[in-house]
């Protein structure tokens, strides 16, 4: 309030004349004086030293009256004058209480409100400081014994926030940010997620509801900060500030003026990553393309919630699974780390699909059946709690569905409720690209059985639970929610059931992958 009082004081008509001081007898034109005040930081810009000194004297007198101390050692002066036809830096002589205000050395800069100013108006000090701070903090985060998701959280919440003011006030080019800070960030992110150099980060830059990690690179944060700065100029109530926006709406600023706000920036960047995954990165974008076309979007946020609670090794497994950079023999051969790309059991190319859901030898050994039955066992154990119902499941320790359906067609699970409603649940756990194919195949397979059972029950409902090996729910699973609701499972319990299904799928697929090219030991069904 004290500083505001002083500002109002020097804005009065008497002292406004200082801003246009004129020696009419010798014909010196009007010279503008500008006073900038922000909290306890002040800056005075004038055309002549004596004008500046006059305003400083007034400020000094006012501070003495207010019993406030001016720390001269914390002040600085910076001077530019015209010599012949060129402008040059010089050392001005301005005093406060007869003490010479420290002068900015020739070729050096001073800092005001976070922005460095020098004679050349370069951003070298900003770049140097940003680089030092960024490297230092990223290195400290890297050394912390934290889960990768927590390291990414520190990077996103702390580091990007810390450098956002520098991004806002400086004129650093976006190119420098991309080539320098983005490179450092991606290097550490790859390290934390155990991603090879060849892996794309387009997946992890997506939002969590699209199976990404919601990571923002420094260049994106920079565009957001510049957008905020430009928007403040454009919509300022001050006409002069609006004019400043109009004058500077050229060259590099055009790329920031196209955005309405920071959300608009994120939307554009993520759209670009999605297009890259769908149209250019065929191998690493196959997962994204499949789930965008065939998954149940309302269930996708649950997947990210489960992923965030996984231990480091399985968490990183899901990331590398999504962008297809797990060490399969096909990838190892591509990277020059393996002499063969073939599976040691069946001699087919060992791709991710082959290891996770495609190898015929693995299928015959029961690896994929073990994963399927682990999910089914959880479902059956959970649904036995439904009151006044009878459950049949095609796994040991439960009544077999063949009691009702016979041996020709045997669904994974049958549930008969007290109101004579028969739920026929068929579970499929396959590769993401086969979500729709598996669902259609099972629907056709059991269509006759459904018609047959309608003669014996008041209602027959088919629940086509088509899941991916990483726990993604296919679109055919939408009626699974309806089934849980009909069985009087509240929203919280339904969410728990779906999360556990995702959890089991991810963990069993991780185990199947780790046992590739190894003897299968027929483990017990996974319990969580």
Q: Whereabouts are the PLM-identified features?
A:
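Active-site metal-binding core of divalent-cation-utilizing nuclease and nuclease-like domains
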Residues: 333-337, 382-426
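Conserved catalytic cores of phosphodiester-cleaving nucleases, focusing on short active-site segments
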Residues: 379, 411-415, 419-433, 444-452, ...
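Basic, alpha-helical interaction scaffolds
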Residues: 95-172, 228-242
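Conserved pre-motif C helix in the palm subdomain of viral-like polymerases
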Residues: 1-18, 159
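Short, conserved micro-motifs composed of acidic
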Residues: 69-108
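Extended C-terminal regions of large enzymes
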Residues: 167, 176, 180-182, 188, ...
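Short Cys/His-based metal-binding microdomains
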Residues: 334-382
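Catalytic palm subdomain of template-directed nucleic-acid polymerases
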Residues: 33-65, 81-85, 121, 362, ...
């Amino acid at each position: 309030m004290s500083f505001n009082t002083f500002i109002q004081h020097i804005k009065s008509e008497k002292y406004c004349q200082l801003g246009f001081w004129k020696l009419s007898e010798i014909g010196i034109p009007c010279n503008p004086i500008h006073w900038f005040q922000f909290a306890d930081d002040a800056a005075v810009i004038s055309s002549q030293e004596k004008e500046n000194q006059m305003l400083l004297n007034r400020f000094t007198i006012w501070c003495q009256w207010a019993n406030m101390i001016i720390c001269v050692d914390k002040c600085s002066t910076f001077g530019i004058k015209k010599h012949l036809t060129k402008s040059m830096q010089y050392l001005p002589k301005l005093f406060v209480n007869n003490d010479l205000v420290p002068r900015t050395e020739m070729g050096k800069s001073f800092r005001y409100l976070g922005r460095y100013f020098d004679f050349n108006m370069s951003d070298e000090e900003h770049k140097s400081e940003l680089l030092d701070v960024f490297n230092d903090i990223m290195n400290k985060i890297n050394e912390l014994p934290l889960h990768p998701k927590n390291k990414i959280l520190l990077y996103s919440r702390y580091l990007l926030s810390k450098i956002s003011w520098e991004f806002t006030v400086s004129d650093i080019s976006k190119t420098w940010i991309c080539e320098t800070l983005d490179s450092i960030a991606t290097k550490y992110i790859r390290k934390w997620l155990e991603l090879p150099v060849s892996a794309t980060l387009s997946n992890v830059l997506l939002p969590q509801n699209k199976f990404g990690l919601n990571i923002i690179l420094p260049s994106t944060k920079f565009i957001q900060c510049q957008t905020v700065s430009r928007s403040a100029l454009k919509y300022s109530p001050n006409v002069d500030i609006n004019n400043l926006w109009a004058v500077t709406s050229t060259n590099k600023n055009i790329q920031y003026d196209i955005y309405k706000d920071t959300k608009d920036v994120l939307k554009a960047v993520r759209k670009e990553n999605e297009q890259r995954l769908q149209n250019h990165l065929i191998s690493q974008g196959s997962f994204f393309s499949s789930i965008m076309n065939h998954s149940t979007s309302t269930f996708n946020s649950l997947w990210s919630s489960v992923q965030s609670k996984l231990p480091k090794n399985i968490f990183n497994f899901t990331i590398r699974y999504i962008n297809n950079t797990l060490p399969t023999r096909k990838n190892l051969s591509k990277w020059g780390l393996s002499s063969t790309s073939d599976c040691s059991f069946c001699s087919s190319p060992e791709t991710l699909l082959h290891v996770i859901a495609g190898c015929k030898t693995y299928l015959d050994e029961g690896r994929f059946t073990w994963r399927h039955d682990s999910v089914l066992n959880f479902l059956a154990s959970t649904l036995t709690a439904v009151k006044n119902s009878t459950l049949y499941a095609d796994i040991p320790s439960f009544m077999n569905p063949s009691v009702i359906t016979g041996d020709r067609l045997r669904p994974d699970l049958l549930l008969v409720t007290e109101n004579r409603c028969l739920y026929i649940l068929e579970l499929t756990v396959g590769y993401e690209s086969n979500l729709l194919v598996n669902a259609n195949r099972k629907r056709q397979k059991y269509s006759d059985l459904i018609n047959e059972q309608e003669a014996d029950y008041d209602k027959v409902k088919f629940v086509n639970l088509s899941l991916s090996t990483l726990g993604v729910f296919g679109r055919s699973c939408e009626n699974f929610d309806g089934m849980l609701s009909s069985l009087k499972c509240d929203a919280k319990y339904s969410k728990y059931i779906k999360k556990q299904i995702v959890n089991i799928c991810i963990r069993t697929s991780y185990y199947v992958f780790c046992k590739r090219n190894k003897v299968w030991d027929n483990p017990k069904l996974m319990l969580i």
